[in-house]
């Protein structure tokens, strides 16, 4: 049986809003088909474009330096935390906004990508997506960090309550060296376990956050 892939990333396009107040992506055509066709004397043609985007665009990974000065940057993230990581998916759709440690009670998440399903991604690219987001509590993040999770992902605007300026989830998880993947989608298509997550950003030295093509291989 051929492998099955589940797409977990939102497509990126010019002008889309990921997080209210941050710059939207801009696309510039550098070489178009007509220009290149002339350059190659009608024998071939190409499209070359540039994408100017904030690191917090679409579905992206946070590295520790995003929250902590002197923390590990994107280039320093170990690939074993980002590629072919066994998944452990938790259904938090009945929790309301605050997702506490009881969701993870008794679960073995050591060395796993903890993926929290809220179904908030159904509001993607609507005004509703920019407020009242589901989030992980500080106690929940303490549990995950202590249990040895390798990555934590969520299909929400933010893993923190955007009204909490302390940002405990980012503080705890990134402080423990655990990458965060936000703005995921299609989590309802995932089994509770048995798949492997791939969510690898570019090795940007000094980079804090960057979009990823996140997917699970079943």
Predicted regions and their residues:
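Active-/binding-site microenvironments in catalytic and ligand-binding cores
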Residues: 1-218
């Amino acid at each position: 049986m051929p492998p099955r892939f589940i797409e977990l990333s939102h497509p990126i396009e010019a002008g889309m809003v990921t997080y209210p107040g941050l710059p939207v992506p801009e696309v510039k055509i550098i070489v178009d088909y007509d220009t290149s066709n002339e350059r190659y004397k009608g024998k071939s043609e190409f499209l070359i474009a540039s994408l100017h985007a904030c690191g917090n665009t679409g579905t992206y990974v946070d590295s520790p330096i995003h929250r902590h000065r002197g923390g590990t940057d994107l280039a320093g993230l170990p690939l074993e935390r980002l590629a072919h990581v066994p998944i452990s998916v938790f259904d938090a759709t009945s929790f309301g906004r605050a997702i506490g440690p009881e969701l993870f009670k008794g679960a073995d998440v050591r060395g796993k990508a903890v993926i929290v399903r809220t179904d908030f991604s159904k509001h993607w690219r609507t005004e509703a997506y920019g407020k009242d987001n589901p989030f992980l509590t500080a106690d929940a993040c303490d549990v995950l960090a202590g249990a040895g999770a390798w990555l934590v992902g969520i299909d929400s605007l933010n893993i923190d309550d955007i009204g909490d300026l302390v940002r405990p989830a980012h503080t705890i998880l990134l402080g423990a060296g655990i990458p965060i993947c936000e703005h995921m989608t299609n989590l309802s298509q995932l089994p509770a376990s048995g798949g492997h997550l791939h969510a690898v950003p570019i090795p940007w030295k000094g980079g804090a956050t960057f979009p990823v093509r996140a997917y699970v291989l079943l």
